UniProtKB/Swiss-Prot annotation:
The gene is murA. This is UDP-N-acetylglucosamine 1-carboxyvinyltransferase. It is found in: Cytoplasm. GO terms for molecular function: UDP-N-acetylglucosamine 1-carboxyvinyltransferase activity. Its EC number is 2.5.1.7. GO terms for biological process: cell division; cell wall organization; peptidoglycan biosynthetic process; regulation of cell shape; UDP-N-acetylgalactosamine biosynthetic process. Pathway: Cell wall biogenesis; peptidoglycan biosynthesis. Cell wall formation. Adds enolpyruvyl to UDP-N-acetylglucosamine. Pfam families: EPSP_synthase. It comes from Vibrio campbellii (strain ATCC BAA-1116). GO terms for cellular component: cytoplasm. InterPro entries: Enolpyruvate_Tfrase_dom, Enolpyruvate_Tfrase_sf, MurA_subfamily, RNA3'P_cycl/enolpyr_Trfase_a/b, UDP_GlcNAc_COvinyl_MurA. Phosphoenolpyruvate binds at K23, N24. The active site is at C116. Belongs to the EPSP synthase family. MurA subfamily.
Length: 421
């Protein structure tokens, strides 16, 4: 099993990072390609384990899939309609195959998925949405099965809870439904907008993505097309926090400040000098004092839960401590005990963590528990005294494209080592 060995330093992280395409847009877009009857090309797709798994799943369904810079998918040859357990057991995103399969082929089944262990992420909202579009759903032998005679039917759907995943499932399925679907209380994340833009490129008629009401006029078929995946706002935020906690200056290229306004506002509140351009963001913490900030996670455009772990670290290193409240997922403070092994001070009370401030961290052996928590541990290792070993880094490989190379380019001393190393 691979690990990261990080030798900490008081030297600030300085330089430029090219941000990859967003995993949380690339995954639903690749699954949405099932809806097309002609080849599609998806550019700016990150090199991640979940992307590789999705490409393999599309191949297993019968699609022709290749990668040469962009990912090319020809879904015209799909002749299987089941996403099997051996492929989806590590990835919750696999549920996104269900809507496109039943919408285009009248049937689909997906093994109940796996992924990060960060609380309840039920597929109920996906199932309810598909049922409201006319699908018959059954649960058998660990599989969710969806069927419909003819086409799905447009409907007025009011979501019980704001859900990014279910919003995408319903939007994709409704694209080929008969009639118009109105989706109220929809999630507003940029990755939903990007998925809608992709579908519209193929001939879908979707409006309102990015607001809490999305309207989908169903069409009979979708053709081919080319799409460029939106920048990864969470990877962007992660490197900006790395600059802040190390007292450095980092410029993120190939990104968009409009995607993470809540994060940039908190970085400025923390004392960072934030500058932005059309496709870049910089954070400069040189000779500036890091100040604690209070964070409350919320659906977009609020503060993203996927940046909570990174700001937990920031608050631990800032003057005054800080309070972070997690409202999206339960059980998402598993990074806190690991950071405390490195000398951080914190107290967890329910869905809130109260951070104490410390002058420095010490290297330790720590364990990654989920995707974003692992990023905070790696950054902590970069600024700690001594050697930090981060175990179970397969979590980080699910969401960060070559993070060790990008950190090394900023001056970090980090390497990937095998168990024997």
């Amino acid at each position: 099993m691979e690990k990261f060995r990080v030798i900490g330093s008081d030297k600030p992280l300085v330089g430029e990072v090219t941000i990859s395409g967003a995993k949380n847009a690339a995954l639903p877009i690749l699954f949405a390609s099932i809806l097309a009857e002609e080849p599609v090309e998806v550019a700016n797709v990150p090199h991640l384990r979940d992307i590789d798994t999705t490409m393999e799943l599309l191949k297993r369904l019968g699609a022709k899939v290749s990668r040469n810079g962009s990912v090319h998918v020809d879904p015209s040859s799909i002749n299987e309609y089941c996403a099997p357990y051996d492929l989806v057991k590590t990835m919750r995103a696999s549920i996104w195959a269900l809507g496109p399969l039943v919408a285009r082929f009248g049937q689909g089944q997906v093994s109940l998925p796996g992924g990060c262990a960060i609380g309840a992420r039920p597929v109920d909202l996906h199932i309810t949405g598909l049922e409201q579009l006319g699908a018959t759903i059954t649960l058998e032998d660990g599989y969710v099965k969806a069927e419909v005679d003819g086409r799905l039917k447009g409907a007025h759907i009011v979501m019980d809870k704001v859900s990014v995943g279910a919003t995408i499932t319903i939007m994709c399925a409704a694209a080929l439904a008969e009639g118009t679907t109105t989706l109220d209380n929809a999630a507003r994340e940029p990755e939903i907008v990007d998925t809608a833009d992709f579908l519209n490129t193929l001939g879908a008629k979707i409006s309102g993505a990015g607001t809490d009401t999305i309207t989908i006029e169903g069409v009979e078929r979708l053709g081919g097309g080319k799409h460029n995946v939106v920048a990864d706002r969470i990877e962007t935020g992660t490197f900006l926090v790395a600059a802040a906690v190390s007292g450095g200056k980092v410029v993120c290229r190939n990104t968009n400040a409009h995607l993470l306004e809540a994060v940039l506002a908190k970085l400025e509140e923390a004392g960072a000098l934030v500058e932005t351009g059309e496709d870049w963001i910089s954070v400069d913490m040189t000779d500036r004092e890091l100040k604690a900030v209070s964070i409350r996670t919320a659906p977009h455009p609020g503060f993203p839960t996927d940046m909570q772990a990174q700001f937990t670290l920031l608050n631990m290193m800032a003057k005054g401590g800080g309070v972070i409240t997690e409202t999206i997922f339960e059980n998402r403070f598993m990074h806190v005990p690991e950071l405390m092994r490195m000398g951080a001070k914190a107290e967890i009370e329910g869905n809130t963590v109260i951070c104490g401030d410390v002058d420095s961290l010490s290297g330790a052996q720590v364990m990654a528990t989920d995707l974003r928590a692992s990023a905070s541990l790696v950054i902590a290792g970069c600024i700690a005294k001594g050697e930090t070993i981060v175990d179970r880094i397969y979590h980080i490989d699910r969401g960060y494209d070559k993070i060790e190379n990008k950190l090394s380019a900023l001056g970090a001393n980090i390497e990937r080592v095998s168990e024997a190393g």
